[in-house]
Amino acid sequence: MLEELSQLGYFLAVATGKSRVGLNRALNACGLLSTFDATRCADETFSKPHPAMLQELTRELGQDMRRTVMIGDTTHDLLMANNAGASGIAVEYGAHPVQQLQACHPIFTAKNVPELHQWLIENA
């Protein structure tokens, strides 16, 4: 999915609560480090739900926040999107219960990766 979105011209970024060392280790272990156009970590800027991570990534990539989508499995992710003026997509297969995610008013909630993939291809 990530490779396809990248090939279609979408910018891919990571905004994480992990440290830079932790993120690079995780992305290297999965062979995904070069897949992302930009990344931002909690030890580099304000933590979620503060909008700074998303604002910095959007600015770095030269994008408009109104065309930015934050995909997240926590309320912190979705609140960061709300605080930054971006759209949020919730994924049910993560850390927080779907009821808590829905309270953040995401534009879409995906039950699984194939459903997320389909929605992104059709709507993003």
Question: For each predicted feature, which ranges?
Answer:
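Short amphipathic alpha-helix with an adjacent loop that forms part of the alpha/beta core around
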Residues: 118-124
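Substrate-recognition "cap/lid" segment bordering the active-site pocket of phosphatases
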Residues: 13, 19-70, 75-84, 98-102
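Catalytic-core regions built around general acid/base machinery
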Residues: 1-9
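Short beta->alpha connector loops at strand-helix junctions that form conserved
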Residues: 43, 92-93
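Short acidic-hydrophobic, aromatic-tinged amphipathic segments that line or gate anion-handling sites
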Residues: 108-112
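The conserved SAM/SAH-binding core of class I Rossmann-like methyltransferase domains
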Residues: 71, 89-91
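Flexible glycine-rich beta->alpha loop in the catalytic core of nucleotide-sugar glycosyltransferases
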Residues: 87, 94-96
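Short phosphate-binding/catalytic loops that engage adenosine nucleotides
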Residues: 10, 86, 106
